Amino acid sequence: MLTWLRSLFRRPDPPAEFRAKQAELLALWFRTAASSGKPRGLTWVGFEPLGEPLFGPGWAVMGAVVQFEPTPDGGLADVPQAREPRPVVAVFAYTRRRWSTGGRAVFNLTAEQVAKQMNRKAGGA
């Protein structure tokens, strides 16, 4: 009973909670992003995390490299670049003491650049 009461009043540590569930969160992000249908004409086939996550108030971002395969009817089967791994930034949200993801994938920016943009939005600038 005492342990349960303590858990109600303990101060959350979002970065530690993220790291404890990092593999699970990344797998959820990949499944969700892959089901989005974007980029059009490509199927998500795998990913490899890059570096360490970056944290801000209520969010985390993490770099990854994603591998794609052209879909049979997507018109990209003859495009060699369609099979090249692409860097991406995975975005996560921390709300109600829980980490989640909507599968948001940011292309053409680094994790540091996305974190800077997220900090600007959080600060109202």
Regions found by a protein language model. Name each.
Residues 66-95:
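Exposed beta-sheet edge and beta->alpha loop/turn motif
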